[in-house]
């Protein structure tokens, strides 16, 4: 039996404590907040998307960084294992669009409560308001924690599960990176991911609140396509957000961080080819041939988007439809298929769902999450240089890495 000290009482820390305790270890969780699972409480808009019910192979496809590192842990504790864990603990689950798995109650508090009950059932010692200042190793092995009040907590093993630096109001302030660096670990520079993006065009605030459904969004660096997907997006006072944009940020964030502008091209009518769309526009023009242009195209766009599209078309809004040239019409059709804005940067960590970057995984054993540099030191969750798309995949990473760490300490 080992004395296991876990730094951080978020998803990864809670999971890891349960698995370590099931092995018969004496387990202590140190959480600096007044309660456990503070970030979990707000995930999935307060509903907590616990995992994704896709095939296990698809878990890797939805990872953005270091998916090969997760091979052992994803298969060691699969998405089905996560679902079984909660169901066996008494939490009923449901699967929604995109295979997203939520508690039937739609309350993240029920997920946290279930994890807490399992911790208590397995004898985990929970220490709230417990701020760890240092993680100390001696002779290449974990030795003790130094608390904020100067006291020491000795143990045989330590799992760092402090999360990243997104949603800092929940206590995610990057402590784990500092602890890891102090023991010789290299850190991939943390950056916001799954985050809205800023746009340069000055008409963007006029579109604030406009949601576009069933559009194709493609991000280009010059002529090089970086990301493309179909779905829903939202305009804000600063730029763009919504599911498509949040996912895109995971792929294009590194380039935007280098102060490099990118083009976001939105196909407003992806179900139609340019020829089919031209035929549709022609029908609108024929039906309204005596109307002014601004009044003839109201059926093509949401009301908020209409003045912007008319302005960008370069066609006089007062012009009668029956005198619009073929060239003007074709340019208008092209605009509908290629509505383009300039991405200038990511929003900051306060708005990021997760953190990209963290403890370099080359220095961590992928089967056990133990440090290759310090014996008895383990990592779990977002503190590692691992990130994935939305849909329950990041919580699956938390669960799988926590299982690998906790279940391998005896």
Q: Model segments located where?
A:
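N-terminal Rossmann-like FAD-binding beta1-loop-alpha1 element of flavoenzymes
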Residues: 3-29, 405-410
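Short hydrophobic core segments
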Residues: 5-7, 30, 132, 152-169, ...
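Glycine-rich FAD pyrophosphate-binding loop
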Residues: 21-45
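An anion/pyrophosphate-binding glycine-rich loop and adjacent beta-alpha core
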Residues: 34-36, 41-42, 50, 56-57, ...
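Glycine-rich active-site loop/strand segments that organize a redox cofactor
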Residues: 47-95
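Feature captures the FAD/FMN-dependent oxidoreductase FAD-binding
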Residues: 76-157
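A glycine-rich dinucleotide-binding beta-alpha-beta segment and adjacent secondary-structure elements
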Residues: 127-129, 134, 307-387
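Glycine-rich loop(s) and the adjacent beta-strand/alpha-helix scaffold that form part
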Residues: 157-203
């Amino acid at each position: 039996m080992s004395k296991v000290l876990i730094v951080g009482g978020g998803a990864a820390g809670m999971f890891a404590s349960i698995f370590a305790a099931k092995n018969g270890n004496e387990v202590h969780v140190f959480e600096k907040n007044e309660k456990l699972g503070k970030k979990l409480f707000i995930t999935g808009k307060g509903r907590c998307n616990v995992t994704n019910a896709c095939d296990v192979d698809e878990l890797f496809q939805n990872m953005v960084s270091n998916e090969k590192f997760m091979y052992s842990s994803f298969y060691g504790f699969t998405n089905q294992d996560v679902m079984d864990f909660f169901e066996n603990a008494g939490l009923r689950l449901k699967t929604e669009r995109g295979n997203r798995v939520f508690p039937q109650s739609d309350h993240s508090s029920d997920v946290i409560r279930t994890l807490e009950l399992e911790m208590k059932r397995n004898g985990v010692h929970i220490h709230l308001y417990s701020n760890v200042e240092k993680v100390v190793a001696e002779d290449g092995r974990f030795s003790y924690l130094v608390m904020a009040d100067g006291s020491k907590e000795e143990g045989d093993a330590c799992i760092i599960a402090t999360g990243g630096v997104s949603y800092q109001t929940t206590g995610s302030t990057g402590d784990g990176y500092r602890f890891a660096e102090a023991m010789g670990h290299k850190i991939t520079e943390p950056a916001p991911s799954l985050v809205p993006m800023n746009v340069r065009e000055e008409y963007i605030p006029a579109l604030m609140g406009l949601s576009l459904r069933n559009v194709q969004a493609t991000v280009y660096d010059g002529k090089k396509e970086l990301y493309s997907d179909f779905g829903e997006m939202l305009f804000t006072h600063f730029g763009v957000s919504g599911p498509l944009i949040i996912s895109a940020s995971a792929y294009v964030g590194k380039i935007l961080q280098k102060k490099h502008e990118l083009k976001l091209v939105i196909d407003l009518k992806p179900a139609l080819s340019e020829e089919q769309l031209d035929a549709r526009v022609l029908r609108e023009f024929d039906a309204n041939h005596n109307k002014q242009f601004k009044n003839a195209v109201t059926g093509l766009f949401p009301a908020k988007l209409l003045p912007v599209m008319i302005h960008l078309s370069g066609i006089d809004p007062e012009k009668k439809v029956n005198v619009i040239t073929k060239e003007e019409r074709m340019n208008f059709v092209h605009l509908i298929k290629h509505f383009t804005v300039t991405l200038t940067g990511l929003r900051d960590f306060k708005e990021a769902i997760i953190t990209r970057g963290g403890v370099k995984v080359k220095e961590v054993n992928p089967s056990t999450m133990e440090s290759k540099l310090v014996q008895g030191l383990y990592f779990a969750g977002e503190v590692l240089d691992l990130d994935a798309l939305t849909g329950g995949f990041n919580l699956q990473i938390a669960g799988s890495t926590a299982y690998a760490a906790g279940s391998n300490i005896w």
